């Protein structure tokens, strides 16, 4: 018997898939075997005496039993002419096949089974086996395997089991037939009862239907009367409604005509509003142009006045310089004559001095000569006097002449001294001392009521003005200051902070050189809009302009809870890449510092632009004629 067949047999016995068999499993599989037979089979298969049959023990024991049977001459399955009994008598099988060995089992044909097959065992002629069971194929395979195993005792036990199982099936079949007969009789009785009930229900339904029809006729008649009355009322009401609708239609026609007229007026008003907006925008641009023209005109007027003052001053300086140059020329002529005479005297005295040179040298080494001391002292005093004289003379008057080598040192010292005096004035933000060299347009921006106008008043008038009116549109102011020794004109454009003037502010940003963005340290909402303002400035300008972020009203920080901290403002300025300063228009703290920082940034940016464009400011060409050149020629 092949191992797969034995494994299948073990799987059939091990219904719970435990991997081993117990005595209870054998009793379930073979309930017709007595305890002695079961114990004998269990002991034969349980080789190690563990009380359970392992799978390997079952396979080995069953295989050894089959081999033992084959060694006794029972190899293969011999199918004999068995007799099958049915109700009509003995019936012989039609197909009789003999298989000599187990190896031919894979190629043997299928067994043809007719209506019912009854196998008659040689060992027990008194038992008829009927294999017409639900699992007929499995039983036949198992029966063939038992026949081929060569264990007659086990085959007899299997035949008893199959016979008892067939007997139980027959009893169950008879019981099922009896129950079917009972069910058929009950069903017939139930059908008769249902027919009687249906007839009764039909009669009752007919009565109820007749009654319902009568009631429905009465109800419909009543409803028809009521509907007729209601229809008459509705007809009269509808006539009234029609008349009212006709009147309303006339009113609506008049109203529609009025609305059409209003629509035409609204369209015309919309066109007029658009034209008004265009005119307002043009007016704003004209105001901007006018303000710029005014600023330029004021700047030109200031430059003109300054030039006139400078021209008159230079005329006075020129006349004074001419007089000074004449006196200096005369003094130099006298000096040259004296120098010539000294040279002649020096030649005549050199011979006399040669004879006494050794004696005079020894005398000079021992004691200094009072004449030399006086000459040295006089030379120092003369140098200081000459230096003061050259400092008093304007440098441009002297520089117009070509100095000779003897006076070049004095001129260099004078230039260096005057340069030192000028360098000492190159610090801070001071009032202008002359015409403006440069002009910068600076736009004041920020939310409403943050102190922009007060900031401008502090810059222009050096005072705090309380209760200033709100700025409408833009206010224009000009302040000329001296920054690091340079006169600079600052045009301050004070814009309105309301949202409705935001588009007007953008037009000023396009022409601005710099911007001062002001927020109120006591109003956090104005600080939160700083980023939007900076983005608006950057979007409106064609190039990057210097911006300073100013936190105003720091004098009120201590009295205001939740004020914006200085570190927050500095962080915002660093993140946006702008300057930062906290100020107070009330006490004027850091106002000048903020303007100084922004002005220096504007000047630095303009210097870079001038260098990048290749513009070089050369000094004026020097005059080729002068008193020194004439003196040298003479």
Curated annotation (Swiss-Prot):
Binding residues for Ca(2+): 46, 48, 50, 52, 57
Descriptive protein name: Ras and EF-hand domain-containing protein homolog
Subunit structure, as described in the record:
Homodimer.
Which residues belong to the propeptide? 632-634
Instruction: Give the residues the record marks as binding GTP.
Output: 449-454, 552-555, 585-586
Where in or outside the cell it occurs: the entry states: Cytoplasm, Perinuclear region
One Gene Ontology biological process: vesicle-mediated transport
Calcium in keyword set:
yes
Record's keyword terms, sorted:
Calcium, Coiled coil, Cytoplasm, GTP-binding, Metal-binding, Nucleotide-binding, Repeat
Question: What family classification does the UniProt entry report for this protein?
Answer: Belongs to the small GTPase superfamily. Rab family.
For molecular function, the Gene Ontology terms on record are: calcium ion binding; GTP binding; GTPase activity
Q: Name one GO cellular component term.
A: perinuclear region of cytoplasm
Q: Which InterPro entries match?
A: EF-hand-dom_pair (IPR011992), EF_Hand_1_Ca_BS (IPR018247), EF_hand_dom (IPR002048), P-loop_NTPase (IPR027417), Rab (IPR050227), Small_GTP-bd (IPR005225), Small_GTPase (IPR001806)
Show the NCBIfam families listed in the entry: small_GTP
Which residues belong to any copy of the EF-hand domain?
A: 5-33, 33-68
Q: Which SUPFAM superfamilies match?
A: EF-hand, P-loop containing nucleoside triphosphate hydrolases
- The region called Disordered is annotated at 216-237, 308-328
Give the highest taxon in the source lineage.
Answer: Eukaryota
Give the encoding gene's name.
rsef-1
Q: Which Pfam families match?
A: EF-hand_7 (PF13499), Ras (PF00071)
Parts forming coiled coils: 169-310
């Amino acid at each position: 018997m092949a191992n797969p067949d034995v494994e299948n047999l073990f799987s059939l016995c091990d219904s719970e898939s435990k991997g081993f068999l117990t005595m209870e499993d054998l009793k379930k599989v073979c309930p017709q075997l007595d305890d002695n037979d079961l114990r004998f089979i269990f002991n034969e298969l349980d080789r190690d005496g563990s009380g359970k049959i392992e799978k390997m023990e079952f396979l080995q024991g069953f295989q050894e039993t089959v081999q033992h049977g084959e060694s006794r001459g029972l190899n293969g399955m011999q199918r004999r002419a068995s007799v099958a009994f049915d109700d009509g008598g003995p019936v012989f099988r039609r197909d009789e096949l003999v298989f000599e060995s187990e190896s031919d089992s894979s190629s043997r044909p299928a067994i043809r089974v007719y209506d019912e097959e009854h196998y008659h065992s040689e060992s027990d002629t008194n038992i008829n086996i009927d294999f017409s069971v639900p699992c007929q194929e499995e039983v036949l395979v198992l029966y063939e395997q038992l026949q081929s195993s060569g264990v007659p005792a086990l085959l007899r036990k299997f035949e008893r089991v199959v016979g008892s199982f067939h007997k139980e099936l027959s009893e169950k079949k008879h019981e099922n037939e009896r129950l079917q007969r009972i069910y058929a009789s009950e069903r017939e009785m139930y059908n008769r009862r249902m027919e009687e009930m249906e007839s009764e229900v039909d009669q009752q339904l007919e009565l109820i239907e007749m009654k319902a029809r009568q009631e429905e006729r009465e109800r419909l008649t009543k409803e028809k009367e009521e509907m007729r009355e209601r229809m008459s009322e509705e007809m009269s009401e509808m006539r009234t409604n029609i008349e009212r609708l006709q009147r309303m239609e006339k009113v609506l026609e008049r109203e529609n005509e009025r609305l059409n007229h209003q629509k035409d007026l609204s369209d015309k008003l919309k066109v007029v509003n658009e034209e008004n907006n265009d005119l307002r925008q043009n007016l704003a641009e004209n105001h901007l142009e006018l303000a710029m023209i005014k600023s330029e005109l004021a700047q030109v007027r200031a430059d003109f006045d300054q030039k006139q003052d400078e021209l008159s001053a230079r005329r006075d300086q020129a006349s004074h310089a001419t007089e000074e140059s004449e006196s200096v020329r005369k003094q130099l002529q006298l000096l040259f004559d004296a120098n010539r005479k000294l040279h002649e005297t020096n030649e005549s005295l050199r011979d006399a001095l040669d004879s006494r040179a050794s004696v005079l040298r020894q005398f000079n080494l021992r004691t200094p000569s009072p004449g030399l001391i006086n000459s040295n002292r006089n030379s120092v005093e003369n140098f200081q006097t000459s230096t003061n004289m050259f400092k008093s003379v304007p440098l441009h008057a002297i520089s117009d002449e070509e100095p000779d080598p003897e006076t070049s040192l004095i001129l260099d010292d004078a230039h260096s001294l005057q340069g030192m005096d000028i360098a000492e004035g190159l610090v801070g933000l001071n009032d202008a001392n002359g015409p403006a060299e440069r002009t910068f347009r600076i736009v004041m921006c920020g939310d409403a009521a943050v102190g922009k106008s007060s900031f401008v008043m502090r810059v222009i008038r050096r005072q705090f003005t309380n209760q200033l009116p709100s700025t409408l549109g833009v206010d224009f102011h000009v302040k000329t200051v001296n920054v690091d020794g340079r006169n600079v004109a600052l045009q301050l454009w004070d814009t309105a902070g309301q949202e409705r003037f935001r588009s007007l502010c953008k037009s000023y940003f396009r022409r601005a050189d710099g911007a001062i963005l002001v927020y109120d340290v006591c109003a956090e909402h104005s600080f939160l809009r700083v980023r939007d303002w900076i983005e608006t400035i950057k979007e409106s300008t064609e190039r990057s302009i210097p911006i300073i972020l100013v936190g105003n009203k720091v004098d009120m920080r201590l009295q205001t809870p939740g004020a914006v901290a200085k570190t927050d403002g500095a962080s915002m300025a660093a993140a946006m890449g702008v300057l930062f300063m906290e100020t107070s228009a009330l006490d004027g703290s850091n106002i000048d510092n903020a303007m100084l920082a922004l002005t220096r940034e504007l000047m630095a940016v303009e210097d870079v632009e001038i260098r990048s464009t290749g513009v070089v400011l050369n000094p004026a060409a020097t005059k080729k004629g002068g008193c020194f050149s004439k003196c040298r020629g003479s």
